[in-house]
Amino acid sequence: MTKNIGLFWLKDDFRITKNFALIEATNKHDQVVAFYLFKEKQFENQEAQKWWVRESLKEFEKKLDLYNIKLEIVKTDTFKSFFVKLFKKKNYSIYWNRTYEPNYLKFDEFLIKNFKDNEVKFNLSKGNILNEIGEIKKGDGTPFKVFTPFWKNAEKFYLEKIPSKNKKIIKCKKKVSFFNKTINTKEIFSQKKWFKKFESYWIPSEQRAFTELKKFINSGIDNYSE
């Protein structure tokens, strides 16, 4: 275990199960802080999304509490302006999961370069996908052009590299803070109250997602359109 704090950048991966960056952070640090960057302008005309994010953060925070991990929400105009300040800080390592949208992939390159330049240890983990882009290739290194052999190889590749069940999120020794200016989930609210009706339809949480998936597999998949 390293003595400095492990920072986990929470993006859109509100899950405990197979959260590889969070697993890596807690396996290497006694103290871990999860942080979420709230870009208020992004949600100016997205009240439904704001509600979903707030409720997801509330549920995820409860899960993190079980592991003595504090969730800190930082309000920022842009990701870049936040990280430019973070580069100057010391005594931390940072972990995050890859997001596969082009803008995020490009931003990862910016982060990697600057963390290296500032001698900050970092770990970029696989996102919520089966295999990374470009991992599945033919013996000669070229991409598959027919689906069936591609899928057979993709399945075999995935099953062979499933992480050990022994590697999981470890409970930290104590809960600590890292950032000076933070907000709480109550400050992420909508001026309009029409979102209240959502609460009768959806419960944003990892556990609810598993429940709905199980229900679909047991009773819905047979009637699902081909």
How should these model regions be labeled?
Residues 1-162:
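Trp/Phe/Arg-rich N-terminal binding region typifying the photolyase-homology
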Residues 148-226:
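Glycine/tryptophan-enriched, flexible segments
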